[in-house]
């Protein structure tokens, strides 16, 4: 008998509009669920250009992103995340590879105490204008158990733990 893995401690969500696309796993083996852009006619989207200048752009089911433009893409969802959990947002590999559209903050983190509309912070790192349409899959979400830990200041510099110097490639390429 098959076990429905999706019903164990489900992630609850609220749709701000009936036309918001339901987040879902693309396949039985998908580790993450897909989130969609919710940009119907008249939606205002917050953007920042390459100079960091803020603008609100009214869109009509499509949003054009020029090279270097960052945008807060609405999903039309509010998550109800259980205490002790968070949702992590990741770029979609195909969108990143083919269109150069990635999460501007590398990974989005939605804490359990955030109960406001979810936006996806995207940037066009490609050389061409890219267009997002209402309903497009824009990122992947993953519900993660939070591990709580304290922070403790120490009075002595930590000792070297391995034979390496520095970071950023310090262990070599091969």
Task: Annotate each language-model stretch with its function.
Residues 1-174:
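DUTPase catalytic domain/fold
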């Amino acid at each position: 008998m098959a076990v429905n893995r999706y019903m164990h401690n489900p992630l609850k969500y609220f749709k701000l509009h009936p036309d918001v696309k339901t987040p879902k796993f693309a396949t039985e083996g998908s580790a993450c669920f897909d989130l969609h852009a919710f940009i119907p006619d008249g939606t205002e989207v917050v953007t920042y250009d390459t100079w960091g200048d803020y603008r609100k752009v009214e869109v009509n089911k499509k949003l054009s992103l020029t090279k270097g433009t960052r945008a807060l893409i609405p999903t039309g969802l509010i998550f109800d995340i259980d205490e002790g959990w968070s949702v992590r947002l990741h770029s979609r590999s195909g969108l990143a590879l083919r269109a150069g559209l990635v999460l501007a903050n590398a990974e989005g983190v939605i804490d359990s105490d955030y109960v406001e509309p979810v936006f996806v912070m995207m940037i066009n790192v490609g050389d061409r204008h890219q267009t997002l349409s209402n309903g497009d899959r824009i990122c992947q979400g993953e519900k993660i158990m939070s591990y709580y830990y304290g922070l403790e200041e120490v009075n002595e510099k930590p000792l070297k733990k391995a034979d390496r110097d520095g970071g950023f490639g310090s262990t070599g390429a091969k």
